[in-house]
């Protein structure tokens, strides 16, 4: 079946003679080794190739889903041959898009010059400039394109200072920050999660940077070590790149952001690597600001994975799985590309500002109370908004045309209609947060709107043509007159043709024009027989919509018309260039308008997500950080409840300062422990984004971090065992968590021996409950840890309920108070359809171990009784001896205690624990 699929789109073979192939093999060998994450393409004008076994296999699987298309340049010479895969331009673009945007590979394209091959284009996940036309032509840009550069410096006192510079090329934005960090780079990881870079520039991967490399690998960020070059002048570069306010001196010297010297040096490296200064489209359009991490809730990579915040790489919003695979998919009902991008930022950047969150919640509530308005905004207005940011970038790079300018004009026309709909809601928050900025931006864009109306020929647009008004130039007037006359003649031929073929009314002959055919006639397929009888006309082609045909006269007029049209477009080029030059001056208000429309799209999306859920979401009541309260009634997991054939059983959580700050959750495997703690974490995250939450009631105090340790899988590729991953992630939690944090931990300590694992889990749970006092959901199989509730009043035990008898085992997925008294491992194995003989064997082994334990306890109990009898006799004798002193008596009791301790008796331990309590 696969062979048939690939044969249907067979690629051209590599048309090179034997001598040319041998020369190419020699050239390819001279290129030497390349990084495994770099793929080299070779442009043969009419096709592209990749070479080498690794690149061929990778690209063949991307393009053809098969390695059957891998060939050999010299199939008869196995010693000197070189593998290759050949592909069309369309498949080359498909491969480049997959490599750069999904798989985080670098791409190089070589072009043949007169005598040799030279590299023409380079691209990486964080530097897509040279591939933008390939990647985003007729494609929505749904993800950000950011790159970071960082430097690490050890201060005199041994403190580790990190300087980070982020460059967002889509938004033309520089962000700088510096901070002190620990040996594990905890703050740096939070920064990487927050910014979501595709690529990171490092000066080295050794020494201090070795741990940084490990962190970046863990977060799926490509690492690049740029070549050291001559010192570029940062101030000079910024003076050219930055957009200064009107009246502001164009001098970056006094910018407060540049006081961050380490981050500034990192920025200098990024500007040089991206070659920003040599692209005229960047000049005068960038903004620079200092990033404040304290504005955002701290997220580590473990929490991002545990809460399923982001979908799997390559998952497009149009895919069915996108909706339930991640929190982003659940919330993302955006209609615009800029809305999709902003939503991706928001879910990774939960806020700590209660005021901003209340504004977002107010707007979402208002939209939910006006469902007709919500649908109008989503389906009628936002759906028709193009990607203004990408259109603005085309303007800045002087690659825009009149059609692009007209699309921007349409947005300027539609925005007042959106404003009118929003005004009708009569909501003060919407007026201040959305409407007021819209009015300001529209005022700034008045000049652009007027220019388009004066210059663009709107009548031509109705015919699908984008032309400058002829009144702007005498030669244009002349050419337009010629085209008008030619069109009139073609209409006369159309009328004459209808009469000749005896077609009128609905069946009349239509005059049409398409790019490949020019002007032609068209009739319905059922009238085909009438046409074939007339020798004055000849059929061009037959399509589903009808029969296209022409005549000698029509063809002559059509050719003349096309010639006039070409000359018209050539004549208007200089005028269009001047219009685009003027339009570039409106880049700033266009960018702001784009951002405001993206924000509206996200808020409407929140409302749609809240209403369309199986059970509608509710507005969370947000309290200040110090309130320390988390009450969620009937909380559900937003992803799980969207899946088919799932009837979600909701549960609740109730944390209050000084009353309860930790749930220790026990219960059988598959009983719902992980889902429960993730549901709580996800609800808190959604509230801090500004969305409503999947509960029946929610009261949430602001948190400063959401930290997680969920799941246990060996990270073999990075050389880390289950236990090492556990320890790395958990140590990060201990270092970062405060009394304002939410921590979710699942099955900690299972990667090592039972006793060590239990000891570590106990110690961490006790530290979080007693010292940190953060809100913690601690799911565990170590029932011993439930004893913490006996010594710490703020720790509560709960379990996932299950019912079992001799034949049946039912998981109830309900959280109930108290400890799960019984283990159900064997029942779960049977539920998972283990072979019955395996289950029976497990039961026998279990019974054997339990019998041994009982026998051991019986022996220990007998020995204990003997010791007690001896002790009683000795104490009785001592008590009757009036000459015995206190020291001798104390020594006797102490020895008795030691003897019993050596017996390792459970009974004695419980008595001792009770007496100590």
Swiss-Prot record:
Give this protein's Gene Ontology molecular function annotations. Answer: ATP binding; ATP hydrolysis activity; ATP-dependent DNA damage sensor activity; DNA binding; mismatched DNA binding
The positions annotated for binding ATP are: 667-674
SUPFAM superfamilies the record matches? DNA repair protein MutS, domain III, P-loop containing nucleoside triphosphate hydrolases
Q: Where in the cell is it found?
A: Nucleus
Keyword field:
ATP-binding, DNA damage, DNA repair, DNA-binding, Nucleotide-binding, Nucleus
Pfam families linked to this entry: MutS_I (PF01624), MutS_II (PF05188), MutS_III (PF05192), MutS_IV (PF05190), MutS_V (PF00488)
Region forming the signal peptide = none
At the top level, the lineage of the source is Eukaryota
Q: Name one GO biological process term.
A: mitotic recombination
InterPro entries found in the cross-reference section: DNA_mismatch_repair_Msh2 (IPR011184), DNA_mismatch_repair_MutS-lik_N (IPR007695), DNA_mismatch_repair_MutS_C (IPR000432), DNA_mismatch_repair_MutS_clamp (IPR007861), DNA_mismatch_repair_MutS_core (IPR007696), DNA_mismatch_repair_MutS_N (IPR016151), DNA_mismatch_repair_MutS_sf (IPR036187), DNA_mmatch_repair_MutS_con_dom (IPR007860)
Its GO CC terms? MutSalpha complex; nucleus
Assembly and interaction partners: Heterodimer of Msh2/Spel and Msh6.
Main function: Involved in postreplication mismatch repair. Binds specifically to DNA containing mismatched nucleotides thus providing a target for the excision repair processes characteristic of postreplication mismatch repair.
Give the UniProt family note.
Answer: Belongs to the DNA mismatch repair MutS family.
The name this protein carries in UniProt is DNA mismatch repair protein spellchecker 1
Give the organism the record lists.
Answer: Drosophila melanogaster (Fruit fly)
């Amino acid at each position: 079946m696969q062979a048939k699929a690939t044969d249907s789109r067979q690629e051209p073979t590599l048309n090179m003679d034997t001598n040319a192939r041998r020369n190419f093999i020699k050239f390819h060998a001279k290129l030497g080794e390349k990084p495994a994450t770099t793929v080299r393409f070779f442009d043969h004008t009419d096709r592209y190739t990749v070479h080498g076994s690794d690149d061929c296999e990778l690209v063949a699987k991307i393009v053809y889903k098969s390695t059957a298309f891998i060939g050999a340049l010299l199939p008869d010479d196995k010693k000197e041959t070189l593998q290759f895969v050949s592909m069309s331009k369309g498949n080359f673009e498909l491969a480049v898009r997959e490599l750069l945007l999904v798989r985080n590979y670098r791409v190089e394209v070589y072009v043949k010059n007169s005598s040799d091959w030279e590299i023409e284009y380079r691209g990486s996940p964080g530097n897509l400039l040279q591939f933008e036309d390939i990647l985003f032509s007729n494609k929505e840009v749904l993800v950000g394109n950011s790159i970071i550069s960082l430097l690490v410096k050890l201060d005199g006192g041994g403190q580790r200072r990190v300087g980070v510079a982020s460059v967002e090329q889509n938004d033309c934005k520089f962000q700088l920050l510096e901070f002190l960090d620990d040996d594990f780079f905890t703050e740096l990881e939070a920064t990487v999660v927050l910014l979501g870079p595709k690529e990171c520039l490092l000066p080295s991967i050794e020494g201090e940077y070795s741990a940084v490399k490990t962190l970046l690998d863990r977060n799926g960020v490509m690492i690049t070590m740029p070549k050291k070059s001559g010192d570029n002048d940062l101030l000079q570069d910024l003076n050219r790149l930055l957009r200064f306010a009107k009246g502001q001196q164009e001098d970056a010297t006094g910018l407060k952001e540049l006081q961050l010297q380490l981050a500034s040096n990192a920025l200098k490296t990024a500007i040089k690597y991206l070659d920003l200064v040599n692209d005229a489209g960047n000049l005068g359009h960038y903004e620079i600001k200092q990033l404040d991490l304290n504005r955002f809730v701290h997220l580590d990579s473990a929490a991002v994975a545990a809460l399923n915040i982001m979908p799997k790489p390559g998952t497009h919003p149009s895919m069915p799985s996108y909706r339930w695979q991640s929190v982003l998919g659940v919330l993302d009902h955006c209609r615009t590309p800029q809305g999709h991008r902003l939503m991706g930022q928001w879910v990774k950047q939960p806020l700590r500002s209660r005021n901003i969150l209340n504004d977002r919640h107010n707007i979402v509530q208002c939209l939910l109370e006006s469902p007709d308005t919500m649908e109008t905004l989503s389906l009628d207005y936002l759906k028709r908004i193009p990607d203004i940011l990408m259109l603005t970038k085309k303007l800045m790079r002087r690659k825009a045309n009149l059609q692009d300018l007209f699309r921007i004009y349409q947005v300027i026309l539609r925005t007042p209609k959106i404003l009118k709909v929003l005004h009708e809601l009569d909501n003060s928050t919407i007026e201040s947060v959305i409407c007021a900025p819209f009015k300001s931006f529209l005022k700034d864009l008045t000049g652009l709107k007027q220019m388009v109306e004066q210059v663009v020929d709107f009548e031509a647009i109705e015919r699908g043509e984008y032309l400058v008004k002829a009144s702007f130039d005498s030669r244009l007037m002349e050419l337009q007159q010629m085209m008008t006359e030619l069109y009139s003649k073609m209409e006369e031929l159309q009328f004459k043709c209808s009469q000749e073929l005896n077609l009128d009314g609905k069946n009349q002959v239509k005059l049409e024009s398409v790019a490949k055919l020019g002007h032609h006639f068209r009739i319905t397929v059922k009238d085909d027989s009438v046409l074939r009888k007339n020798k004055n006309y000849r059929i061009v082609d037959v399509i589903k919509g009808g029969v296209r045909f022409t005549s000698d006269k029509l063809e002559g007029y059509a050719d003349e018309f096309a010639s006039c049209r070409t000359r018209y477009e050539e004549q208007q080029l200089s005028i269009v260039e001047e219009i685009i030059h003027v339009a570039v001056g409106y880049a700033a208000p266009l960018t702001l308008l784009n951002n405001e429309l993206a924000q509206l799209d996200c808020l409407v999306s929140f409302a749609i997500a809240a209403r369309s859920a199986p059970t509608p979401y509710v507005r969370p009541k947000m309290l200040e950080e110090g309130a320390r309260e988390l009450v969620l009634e009937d909380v559900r997991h937003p992803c799980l409840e969207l899946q088919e054939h799932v009837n979600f059983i909701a549960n609740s959580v109730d944390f209050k300062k000084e009353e309860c700050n930790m749930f220790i959750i026990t219960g059988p495997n598959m009983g719902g422990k992980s889902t429960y703690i993730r549901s709580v974490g996800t609800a808190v995250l959604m509230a801090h984004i500004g969305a409503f939450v999947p509960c029946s009631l929610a009261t949430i105090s602001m948190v400063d971090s959401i930290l997680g340790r969920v799941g246990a899988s060996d990270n073999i590729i990075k050389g880390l065992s289950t236990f090492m991953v556990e320890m790395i992630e958990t140590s990060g939690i201990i270092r970062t968590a405060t009394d304002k944090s939410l921590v979710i931990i699942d099955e900690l300590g299972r990667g090592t021996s039972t006793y060590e694992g239990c000891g570590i889990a106990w110690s961490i749970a006790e530290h979080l409950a007693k010292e940190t006092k953060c809100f913690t959901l601690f799911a565990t199989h170590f029932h011993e840890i439930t004893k913490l509730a006996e010594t710490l009043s703020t720790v509560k035990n709960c379990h996932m309920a299950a019912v079992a008898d001799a034949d049946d085992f039912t998981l109830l997925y309900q959280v109930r108070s108290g400890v799960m008294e019984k283990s159900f491992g064997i029942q779960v194995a049977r539920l998972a359809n283990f072979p019955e003989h395996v289950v029976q064997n497990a039961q026998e082994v279990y019974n054997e171990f339990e019998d041994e334990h009982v026998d051991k306890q019986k022996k220990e109990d007998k020995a204990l009784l003997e010791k007690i009898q001896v002790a009683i006799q000795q104490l009785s004798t001592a008590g009757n001896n009036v000459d015995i002193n206190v020291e001798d008596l104390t020594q006797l009791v102490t020895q008795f205690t030691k003897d019993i301790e050596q017996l390792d008796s459970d009974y004695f331990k419980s008595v001792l624990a009770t007496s100590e309590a």
